[in-house]
From Swiss-Prot:
Gene3D superfamilies: Sodium/glucose cotransporter. The keyword NAD does not apply. NCBIfam families: PRK09395.1, PRK12488.1, sss, symport_actP. Its main location: membrane. CDD domains: SLC5sbd_u4. The keyword Nuclease does not apply. This is Cation/acetate symporter ActP. It comes from the Bacteria. Signal peptide: none annotated. Disulfide bonds: none annotated. Transports acetate. It comes from Escherichia coli O9:H4 (strain HS). One of its GO terms (cellular component) is plasma membrane. Belongs to the sodium:solute symporter (SSF) (TC 2.A.21) family.
Length: 549
């Protein structure tokens, strides 16, 4: 159970997300032709959208932010599509299938970061930034050092997330489609590069919107059929599930997932603040026209995601009833065919037959593509906009910047494919957990304090940001997941699986201490600039001109 939790805990939406940690033993399934045909339809349709988008991408603004022409509703759907993962869909329903009520608590953990984004970040981020969150962090601070730190934080998060996505994609497709792992990884990598290379943010947005609609439809249909089976009574749903589950009434008892309060708190903080520091999520707020639309984006996204995670709870209990109690879905040893992560897929077959099973399998693949496209664009923009155009070659033309961005997309895609193949048999669950810890410990403190704390200086942001990033990496390496399970040592030096509680504390303390003790003239000037930044963040004055910081 501990390994299941570790794998799933590392698959935060994180969104974001894709088969973030379909890890452990994978049994290749027979080739599923219905799923392959439906997925090919999705690919052809989205490539058509990419061609359409490529005709409309004429400038840097079009490429990075779809020209700021996405509506709040569309962006909310796209954010949900970027955040709701195959791990969310398969992993949480599998967690409910095995642990019951605890799965609901865990699924709600995916949402706790969104009120922070809604009330503290979305409006000011949109008013101050243009293409990346580094625009905001460096608004009144030194451009070079802050952009380098922000870009490094973004690239580390993107790289870890992308590797986990690619490995998860290969294993998931092997499970659902019966395709060879290497073919699956190459296919995801090539499609990802095509979406981003030719269609930029516009194509990525519509891939994410389509994926969100398909996933919400599929999950809604499954939940509807489950509730129909029990007469639309939650009481009947829980009673029937308790009657057939090996744990009986214990599946309705909370508290079995995390072994101690420190781990629970650290996991919660990582989920909450990590979400608010994910570069591919933050980038989406620059695709709308103003702060009002940015707020609407979060409102709609939170609604869609909250609805989705409630559905996964119903799907998990439905799987207990209709899959767990049906020997047709068990192997000779009495285990679920393909492993517990297949619970939702088997339920799709139980409630909708082979055709719907093919649909859900294709949606799971589409989910991965939507996430990796967003990640790739975020990584490319960090290199081309933050590093190339604002640090290494100031004054670069739009054409030069876009060329660097597209070269970066190709490099990221090739690296992702190679590492996806190399990590095939490795435990990659820790990578997404580490990505969230870094986002929470490096990106989030700098974004938050740059917008809200007038005494922040470049010195404080640099020292605190780097300390948070390094602490998260070191503690993760010394913890049980890497030190014991991967490196094979007998006992972990750092006893907790989740470093966020400690690394976030180090980051905030470092930023406070080194800013408070900064008596330089540069520090004083940066403090004075806060008032002008505050007015811009509240009013959005000047944002219409798309000022480049």
């Amino acid at each position: 159970m501990k390994r299941v939790l570790t794998a799933l805990a590392a698959t935060l939406p994180f969104a974001a997300n894709a088969a973030d940690a379909i890890s452990g033993a994978v049994e290749r399934q027979p080739t599923n032709w219905q799923a392959i045909i439906m997925f090919l339809i999705f690919v052809v349709f989205t490539l058509g959208i990419t061609y359409w988008a490529s005709k409309r991408v004429r400038s840097r603004s079009d490429y990075y932010t779809a020209g700021g022409n996405i509506t709040g509703f569309q962006n909310g759907l796209a954010i949900a599509g970027d955040y709701m993962s195959a791990a969310s869909f398969l992993g949480i329903s599998a967690l409910v299938f095995t642990s019951g009520y605890d799965g609901l608590i865990y699924s709600l953990g995916f949402l706790v970061g969104w009120p922070i984004i809604l009330f503290l970040i979305a409006e000011r981020l949109r008013n101050l930034g243009r293409y990346t969150f580094a625009d905001v962090a460096s608004y009144r601070l030194k451009q070079g050092p802050i952009r380098i730190l922000s870009a490094c934080g973004s690239l580390v998060v993107v790289a870890l997330y992308l590797i986990a996505q690619m490995v998860g994609a290969g294993k998931l497709i092997e499970l659902l489609f019966g395709l060879n792992y290497h073919i699956a990884v190459v296919l995801v990598g090539v499609l990802m590069m095509m979406y981003v290379l030719f269609g930029g943010m516009l194509a990525t947005t519509w891939v994410q919107i389509i994926k969100a609609v398909l996933l919400l439809f599929g999950a809604s249909f499954m939940a509807f059929m489950v509730m129909k089976h029990v007469g639309f009574s939650f009481n009947n749903l829980f009673s029937e599930a308790m009657a057939v589950h090996p744990k009986g009434v214990d599946i309705m008892k909370p508290g079995g997932l995390v072994k101690d309060p420190i781990s629970a708190l650290s996991l919660g903080l990582g989920l909450m603040f990590g979400t608010a520091g994910l570069p591919h999520i933050l980038m989406r707020f620059f695709t709308v026209s103003d702060a009002r639309e940015a707020r609407k984006s979060v409102f709609y996204a939170t609604g869609f995601m909250g609805y989705f995670y409630i559905l996964t709870f119903i799907i998990g209990f439905g799987a207990i009833m209709l899959v767990g109690a049906n020997p047709e879905y068990k192997d000779a040893a009495g285990h679920l065919i393909g492993g517990n992560n297949m619970a939702a897929v088997h339920l799709a077959n139980a409630v909708g037959g082979n055709l719907f099973l093919g649909f859900i399998s294709a949606v799971a693949f589409a989910t991965i593509l939507a996430v990796v496209a967003g990640l790739t664009l975020a990584g490319a923009s960090a290199v081309s906009h933050d590093l190339y155009a604002n640090v290494f070659k100031k004054g670069a033309t739009e054409r030069e910047e876009l060329r660097v961005s597209k070269i970066t997309v190709l490099i990221l895609g090739v690296i992702a494919i190679i590492l996806g193949v190399l990590f095939e048999n490795q435990n990659i669950a820790f990578m997404v957990g580490l990505a969230f810890a870094i986002a929470a410990s490096c990106n989030f403190p700098i974004i938050l304090l740059s917008m809200y704390w007038s005494k922040l200086t470049t010195r404080g942001a640099m020292m605190g940001g780097w300390l948070g990033l390094i602490t998260a990496v070191v503690l993760m390496i010394l913890g049980p997941t890497i030190w014991v399970q991967i490196l094979g040592h007998e006992k972990a030096i750092f006893p907790y699986e989740y470093p966020a509680l400690f690394s976030i504390s180090v980051a905030f303390l470092g930023i406070w201490f080194f800013s408070a003790t900064d008596n330089s003239a540069e520090g004083a000037r940066e403090r004075e600039l806060f008032r002008a930044q505050f007015i811009r963040s509240q009013t959005g004055f000047g944002v219409e001109q798309g000022r480049a910081h």
